[in-house]
Amino acid sequence: MHWLLSLVAKLPLGFLQGFGACIGELVFWLSPGYRRRTRDNLRHAGYNEAKFFTKVGRNAGRQSMESIWVWYRPTKAVLSRVKISPQAEHIIGSAMTSGRPIVFLTPHVGCFEILPVWLAGTHYEKTGRRITILYRPPRKEILRAVV
């Protein structure tokens, strides 16, 4: 599995995002349970418009392919794609050098896997701060070996 994912990660990020969107939409429309849960969750959150519903599958697929790209690419390649405002850089840099504990809450929007790579690549050398990440292991055994 690792060899296949590392091969996939060699493809350009833009291609993977487009491919992920296609696969995500296909899975979305072929899985009635996934569509039902998505519709229910969106309604519970107050999003009743169809435009939100139709984007979920595409964006889930994009996120999956982006994650593979982040996990299997060299740190330098990943960091070259990060765009951060000077204000955010200052706030995070000050927090990292303060010595106080920091909690980063990363919603599952976009490629949330990139934050730990960015922190390690930009601030770890300067501060020596450790990073602890809380997550729920994947339910599927094949994915547990990857994550």
Question: PLM ranges: what are they?
Answer:
Residues 100-147:
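Catalytic core of membrane glycerolipid acyltransferases/transacylases, capturing the structured
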Residues 1-111:
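Membrane-anchoring hydrophobic helices of lipid-metabolizing enzymes
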